[in-house]
Amino acid sequence: MPKVHKGVTTELIGIDGNSYAPFYNNLDLKRMIQINSGLDGDPDIDYNWSTVTDYLDLFDKKVAVNIAYVVGNSPLRVGAMGWSANKANSKELDTQKGLLREAMQEGAFGMSTGLDYPPGNYADTD
């Protein structure tokens, strides 16, 4: 039975540090989708978004539930320092904060973290 028939009206997406926006380089987006394909599948869609606004527009009037999107630490990290396994320096952390601020202004509900999947597993816990 679909969740909506059970009264579920909102889905939280972007959990565990994995999310699909913002990605300003389409190759990085495709790489993230490929890494997560074992968890999320690999749907046959055009991966042509970059911002949170663009991503949320994919769901607008196309799904039966409300979407609450949280930005994962992984796209923030990739946006600031690529796929590097190094510890983020202060400039890279500031860039990540700026990307998160922008994402929330575009409609993200919050941020999620996860240290089990790349590139989030490269992050330092400090």
Q: What is each residue range found by the language model?
A:
Residues 102-126:
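Divalent metal-binding pocket/active-site signature
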Residues 1-110:
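Divalent-metal coordination cores built from histidine and acidic residues
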